[in-house]
Amino acid sequence: MREIVHVQGGQCGNQIGAKFWEVISDEHGVDPTGTYHGDSDLQLERINVYYNEATGGRYVPRAVLMDLEPGTMDSVRAGPFGQLFRPDNFVFGQTGAGNNWAKGHYTEGAELIDSVLDVVRKEAEGCDCLQGFQITHSLGGGTGSGMGTLLISKIREEYPDRIMETFSVFPSPKVSDTVVEPYNATLSVHQLVENADEVMVIDNEALYDICFRTLKLTTPTYGDLNHLVSACISGVTSCLRFPGQLNSDLRKLAVNLIPFPRLHFFMVGFAPLTSRGSQQYRALTVPELTQQMFDAKNMMCASDPRHGRYLTASAMFRGRMSTKEVDEQMLNVQNKNSSYFVEWIPNNIKSSVCDIPPKGLKLASTFIGNSTAIQEMFKRVAEQFTAMFRRKAFLHWYTGEGMDEMEFTEAESNMNDLVSEYQQYQDATAEEEGEYVEDEDEMDGM
């Protein structure tokens, strides 16, 4: 079977992860003690994508939980599904990274990383046919960003041919948790460009907007935000876990979504958006799902896809529907909005269909888009980074942990390169490919 090893790191990663396991357990009919109480054999058929079967028929998440302080893990353990996890798979330090990327990547995190790798290795060895790793973390703090990227590079060394997929929470434009977010995020992106295969870009502000605007929640909690993220993670892997007419897996996703190796930062969306607890009263149709899925207000990161063009996109539909209708809708989207898709990649939307919808819905869909508009996120972080770095503000916290200014400069230029690469393909047209003369003129005009 195609197993996935799930790793969650830092406060944000552990909170998203905990929510994700609630959603997945619900889909597979697993209760908080790990006992199966489902109503359909399909729930068990490929349950081993995310679960190991333990003695007495209990199902245990194939999850590794890491943090540099015990706090968040204690609350996960005390949470509704806390008893589900394997106790040995909690790996934590006592010091904390104090929102400092260098502590997570070079000092505190480096001391703990081997114990994390031991657990990862043990989980990977128990797999029949390991598909890859999925990691939930944030890029603004110290542990998820610093230690998270350290773990990614270590796993990359040991399992070079497995897919590495991350769900990364980027710093929000208006809401900032910590002053040094731009530093931590830039240093992390520098790593993710090189070592991750697929990065799903999420950001709290966009999630707040969705809760506020679409779900009409007046005071959204992190629980509500994480619920949205979980719906996406669950949708991405639904084809691995349930039978479908058009299957996809992490590798097919990568092949279809990544035209150039560095451009693997995706926007994600989910439809239909329903608030927790309010079930949908009328079933959506495939055209309505498609409409909502491609809506800019539906994107879980603060970039507007209308400001760029889609290089590629992927739609995963769940529920009983005709594949013909799905194909028609996908073509329809491309024809109606052709200016938002690059014309030098024809038919650039991949669709897959999984027969089993999420709990409580008849039809649902998950959207993943590789849009050049994502450069807005990077630009925003880069501006904040440069503003502080020019004055060397807060830098002593990083150099004190043994970091070199050089690494900051490299990270900065790597991120700026990424932005220009996205811009270059946004401007490219079908005729120009191969005619370098015009390219040069364009560069002058920029």
Curated annotation (Swiss-Prot):
<dbReference type="GO" id="GO:0005737">
    <property type="term" value="C:cytoplasm"/>
</dbReference>
<dbReference type="GO" id="GO:0005525">
    <property type="term" value="F:GTP binding"/>
</dbReference>
<feature type="region of interest" description="Disordered">
    <location>
        <begin position="426"/>
        <end position="446"/>
    </location>
</feature>
<feature type="binding site">
    <location>
        <position position="69"/>
    </location>
    <ligand>
        <name>Mg(2+)</name>
    </ligand>
</feature>
<dbReference type="GO" id="GO:0046872">
    <property type="term" value="F:metal ion binding"/>
</dbReference>
<dbReference type="InterPro" id="IPR013838">
    <property type="entry name" value="Beta-tubulin_BS"/>
</dbReference>
<keyword id="KW-0342">GTP-binding</keyword>
<feature type="binding site">
    <location>
        <position position="11"/>
    </location>
    <ligand>
        <name>GTP</name>
    </ligand>
</feature>
<dbReference type="InterPro" id="IPR002453">
    <property type="entry name" value="Beta_tubulin"/>
</dbReference>
<keyword id="KW-0963">Cytoplasm</keyword>
<dbReference type="GO" id="GO:0005874">
    <property type="term" value="C:microtubule"/>
</dbReference>
<comment type="subunit">
    <text>Dimer of alpha and beta chains. A typical microtubule is a hollow water-filled tube with an outer diameter of 25 nm and an inner diameter of 15 nM. Alpha-beta heterodimers associate head-to-tail to form protofilaments running lengthwise along the microtubule wall with the beta-tubulin subunit facing the microtubule plus end conferring a structural polarity. Microtubules usually have 13 protofilaments but different protofilament numbers can be found in some organisms and specialized cells.</text>
</comment>
<feature type="compositionally biased region" description="Acidic residues">
    <location>
        <begin position="429"/>
        <end position="446"/>
    </location>
</feature>
<keyword id="KW-0479">Metal-binding</keyword>
<dbReference type="InterPro" id="IPR018316">
    <property type="entry name" value="Tubulin/FtsZ_2-layer-sand-dom"/>
</dbReference>
<keyword id="KW-0460">Magnesium</keyword>
<feature type="binding site">
    <location>
        <position position="69"/>
    </location>
    <ligand>
        <name>GTP</name>
    </ligand>
</feature>
<dbReference type="InterPro" id="IPR023123">
    <property type="entry name" value="Tubulin_C"/>
</dbReference>
<dbReference type="GO" id="GO:0005200">
    <property type="term" value="F:structural constituent of cytoskeleton"/>
</dbReference>
<keyword id="KW-0493">Microtubule</keyword>
<dbReference type="GO" id="GO:0007017">
    <property type="term" value="P:microtubule-based process"/>
</dbReference>
<dbReference type="InterPro" id="IPR003008">
    <property type="entry name" value="Tubulin_FtsZ_GTPase"/>
</dbReference>
<dbReference type="GO" id="GO:0003924">
    <property type="term" value="F:GTPase activity"/>
</dbReference>
<feature type="binding site">
    <location>
        <position position="138"/>
    </location>
    <ligand>
        <name>GTP</name>
    </ligand>
</feature>
<feature type="binding site">
    <location>
        <position position="226"/>
    </location>
    <ligand>
        <name>GTP</name>
    </ligand>
</feature>
<dbReference type="InterPro" id="IPR037103">
    <property type="entry name" value="Tubulin/FtsZ-like_C"/>
</dbReference>
<dbReference type="InterPro" id="IPR036525">
    <property type="entry name" value="Tubulin/FtsZ_GTPase_sf"/>
</dbReference>
<feature type="binding site">
    <location>
        <position position="143"/>
    </location>
    <ligand>
        <name>GTP</name>
    </ligand>
</feature>
<keyword id="KW-0206">Cytoskeleton</keyword>
<dbReference type="InterPro" id="IPR017975">
    <property type="entry name" value="Tubulin_CS"/>
</dbReference>
<keyword id="KW-0547">Nucleotide-binding</keyword>
<dbReference type="InterPro" id="IPR000217">
    <property type="entry name" value="Tubulin"/>
</dbReference>
<comment type="similarity">
    <text>Belongs to the tubulin family.</text>
</comment>
<comment type="function">
    <text>Tubulin is the major constituent of microtubules, a cylinder consisting of laterally associated linear protofilaments composed of alpha- and beta-tubulin heterodimers. Microtubules grow by the addition of GTP-tubulin dimers to the microtubule end, where a stabilizing cap forms. Below the cap, tubulin dimers are in GDP-bound state, owing to GTPase activity of alpha-tubulin.</text>
</comment>
<dbReference type="Pfam" id="PF03953">
    <property type="entry name" value="Tubulin_C"/>
</dbReference>
<feature type="binding site">
    <location>
        <position position="204"/>
    </location>
    <ligand>
        <name>GTP</name>
    </ligand>
</feature>
<dbReference type="InterPro" id="IPR008280">
    <property type="entry name" value="Tub_FtsZ_C"/>
</dbReference>
<feature type="binding site">
    <location>
        <position position="144"/>
    </location>
    <ligand>
        <name>GTP</name>
    </ligand>
</feature>
<feature type="binding site">
    <location>
        <position position="142"/>
    </location>
    <ligand>
        <name>GTP</name>
    </ligand>
</feature>
<dbReference type="Pfam" id="PF00091">
    <property type="entry name" value="Tubulin"/>
</dbReference>
<protein>
    <recommendedName>
        <fullName>Tubulin beta chain</fullName>
    </recommendedName>
</protein>
